[in-house]
Amino acid sequence: MVTFFKNAKKFLDLKSAHEEYHALHYKEGRVYASSASVLVWLDEEFGKRGSYDFVTGEKADVRMPEFEKVIPPVDARAVHVVLESDELAKLCVVLKSIAAIAAKVPEVTSVRLHWDPMGLQVETEAHNHVSVTYAATGRVHGYTPDMDIRACAHTKHLADLIGYFHQRGTDLRIYAPLRVSNQSPLYFAADGTGSVLGQVYDAEIRQD
């Protein structure tokens, strides 16, 4: 629980005109933190319902988003990779390093993800500046050789999520998008917690 609240500010947007992104939302044994691009939740019985301002802790008069509608309906057959804590630690370092570079090289503010038989490939490139490729090794489920599964994510948002899940010290399941060509959201799941991350537009992937 402490890990969630310590990281929650990273997943909100306190500067947004949409006040629902300033609040933590409690509903049916779950607390949500969200922005326009990121949704993270924790399963726990908190004994309260409704929305509460993150800064003041006071009840917020905002409309609670319908979070259930944006969570991808994955099942046991869905393609996903399971990363253990030590691999998450390495991936977190890589993503934070890329995010630091992005402050000077805007072309690397996003990274491409590619699911393969060994795990998850993470890569980014800025012509004449930098090229980074990292293979996160994990247990792959649901993948077949004929699949070409790619996605594009905001580097800092992904780094923040991976950092959060690593701090929890459990395995993380990273699901492939259910509709690759539509760049549907990415789904992350661990014991008692999960997240949804919207993709960054990529003309080479999107075909709608």
Model features per residue range: what roles?
Residues 1-208:
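DNA polymerase processivity clamps
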